[in-house]
Amino acid sequence: MKKEGILNSELAKIADDLGHTDQVCIGDLGLPVPSGVKKIDLALTRGKPTFQEVLDIYLENILVEKIYLADEIKENNPEQLKILLTKLSADVEVVFVSHETLKLMNHDVKAVVRTGENTPYSNIILQSGVAL
């Protein structure tokens, strides 16, 4: 049994298998998951686990070179955005796209991780970097 790192076996497998430029999405309760894309449903109740809790686990365990966020988060959930941006290293590229574009991008991610988050536009696509 692992005693640290990502303990959830499905989350760990996705993180372990990410190659350079591979992507994983962390989403809120309402984010649709495209047919054929792996869904890891962590939602226990409304609000648990939070988007930030799940994001923290991935940021601690994978090298992220770029993130994608819905542009709508700026106006509709600025506090979530503010907290999120403070967690990123300075070299992470931040790209804002429309929420519709973000949903379309989910067709190409390795997995969508569903949290219990119930605040608007709490969705992110993490793009894996390379440690060379």
Curated annotation (Swiss-Prot):
Belongs to the RbsD / FucU family. RbsD subfamily. Pathway: Carbohydrate metabolism; D-ribose degradation; D-ribose 5-phosphate from beta-D-ribopyranose: step 1/2. The lineage of its organism: Bacteria, Bacillati, Bacillota, Bacilli, Lactobacillales. Its main location: cytoplasm. GO terms for cellular component: cytosol. InterPro entries: D-ribose_pyranase, RbsD-like_sf, RbsD_FucU. GO terms for biological process: D-ribose catabolic process. The active site is at H20 (proton donor). It catalyses: beta-D-ribopyranose = beta-D-ribofuranose. It is an enzyme of class 5 (isomerase). SUPFAM superfamilies: RbsD-like (SSF102546). Keywords: Carbohydrate metabolism, Cytoplasm, Isomerase. One of its GO terms (molecular function) is monosaccharide binding. Signal peptide: none annotated. It comes from Lactococcus lactis subsp. cremoris (strain MG1363). It is found in: Cytoplasm. Its EC number is 5.4.99.62. It comes from the Bacteria. Substrate binds at D28, H99, Y121, S122, N123. HAMAP family: D_rib_pyranase. Catalyzes the interconversion of beta-pyran and beta-furan forms of D-ribose. This is D-ribose pyranase.
